């Protein structure tokens, strides 16, 4: 599967003929392990090994591919002494994602009834 994503206007976006920013973001977030990586990095930077363990031993190859994509999208950065962490933009994403997490909790309780 060809690598697609990053900055709108630079590449085609899977599932979109427009390449609008929201479509590019949803394309990136919809890739396997992407949301999990962002979720695990929300608290503190992690080394590759710690991140892999936190991600239920995801394949090192796919984990590295996703980290590269997230770095290209400016959501994650490699910090020399502490491993991978969220950038300022990544932290902004995590902050904006939390209302969806809270909604999912409420939805889960209602769906269980």
Named regions from a protein language model:
Residues 2-9, 16-21, 39, 95-113:
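Amphipathic alpha-helical dimerization/coiled-coil segments
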Residues 1-9, 54-66:
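Membrane-interacting alpha-helical segments
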Residues 49-50, 63, 102, 112:
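Short linear functional motifs in flexible/disordered or boundary regions
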Residues 15-62, 73-75, 84-91:
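N-terminal helix-turn-helix DNA-binding core of bacterial DNA-binding proteins
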Residues 68-113:
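Charged, amphipathic alpha-helical coiled-coil/dimerization segments
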């Amino acid at each position: 599967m060809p690598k697609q994503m990053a900055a709108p206007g630079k590449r085609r976006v899977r599932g979109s003929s427009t390449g609008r920013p929201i479509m590019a973001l949803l394309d990136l977030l919809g890739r396997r392990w992407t949301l999990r990586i962002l979720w695990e990095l929300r608290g503190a930077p992690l080394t590759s090994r710690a991140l892999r363990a936190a991600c239920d031993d995801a394949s090192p190859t796919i984990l590295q591919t996703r980290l590269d994509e997230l770095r290209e999208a400016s959501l994650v950065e490699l910090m020399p002494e502490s491993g991978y962490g969220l950038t300022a933009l990544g932290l902004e994403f995590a902050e904006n994602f939390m209302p969806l997490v809270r909604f999912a909790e409420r939805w889960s309780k209602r769906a269980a009834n």
